[in-house]
Swiss-Prot record:
SMART domains reported in the protein's UniProt record: HhH1 (SM00278)
Primary location recorded for the protein, binned into one broad class: cytoplasm
Organism of origin: Bacteroides thetaiotaomicron (strain ATCC 29148 / DSM 2079 / JCM 5827 / CCUG 10774 / NCTC 10582 / VPI-5482 / E50)
Taxonomic classification: Bacteria, Pseudomonadati, Bacteroidota, Bacteroidia, Bacteroidales
Protein name stated in the entry: Holliday junction branch migration complex subunit RuvA
Start and end residues of each stretch annotated as Domain II: 64-142
Length: 201
């Protein structure tokens, strides 16, 4: 079992990271929160969850143990798989998600793509008691937008559309939504564009 991977950050997109460990590249699916945390770093450490199925072996990477713990709680809920859990953690920071579950805010949770009202309610019912112990741990929230690297709008557009297609959305509607967001907020960093797009697609 892989607990974590530490090494050179060889490749990074809003949806995946490749860590070079002594010449071996480990590709891991990541959330936007982890992307924000490791963006711009030469070396990094990702805590790993291994999803092993008959037809696939997939790694999910997290910048800290708290995000991984919340991910594991999410996938313990019936109907929530790895990609859906990652999408939830891309739309909401761990601190925001803890707050949503603690306050039973199903309406906010169902704004995440792929989460209907029934699934949102199931997440809250199943995790409310389990998540209470994590509230203080993740209260620190996510990285401030001011610390994120700024990119030209075209580059942001390309990265955002690429990330959305990797998450399973069709390219054409993704492009349309991303362009609309950049028209409203030309200086928005890529992770903000993707978060907004996830709520509109």
């Amino acid at each position: 079992m892989i607990e974590y991977v530490r090494g050179e950050l060889a490749e990074l997109s809003p949806a995946t990271a490749v860590i070079d460990c002594n010449g071996v590249g480990y590709a891991a699916n990541i959330s936007l929160n982890t992307y924000s945390a490791i963006q711009g770093k030469k070396n990094c450490k990702l805590y790993i969850y291994e999803a092993i199925r008959e037809d696939a072996y997939v790694l999910y990477g997290f910048a800290d143990k708290q995000e991984r713990e919340i991910f594991l709680l999410l996938i313990s809920v019936s109907g929530i798989g790895g990609n859906t859990a990652r999408m939830i953690l891309s739309a909401l920071s761990p601190a925001e998600l803890v707050n949503v579950i603690s306050t039973e805010n199903a309406n906010l949770l169902k704004t995440v793509k792929g989460i209907g009202l029934k699934t949102a309610q199931r997440v809250i019912v199943d995790l409310k008691d389990k998540i209470k112990t994590m509230g203080a741990t993740v209260a620190g929230g996510s990285a401030s937008a001011g610390m994120l690297l700024q990119s030209a709008s075209v580059e942001v557009q390309e990265e955002a559309v690429a990330a959305l297609t990797m998450l399973g959305f069709a390219a054409a509607p993704s492009q349309k939504v991303v362009l609309a967001i950049l028209k409203e907020e030309p200086d928005a960093p890529v992770e903000k564009v993707i978060k907004l797009a996830l709520k509109r697609l």
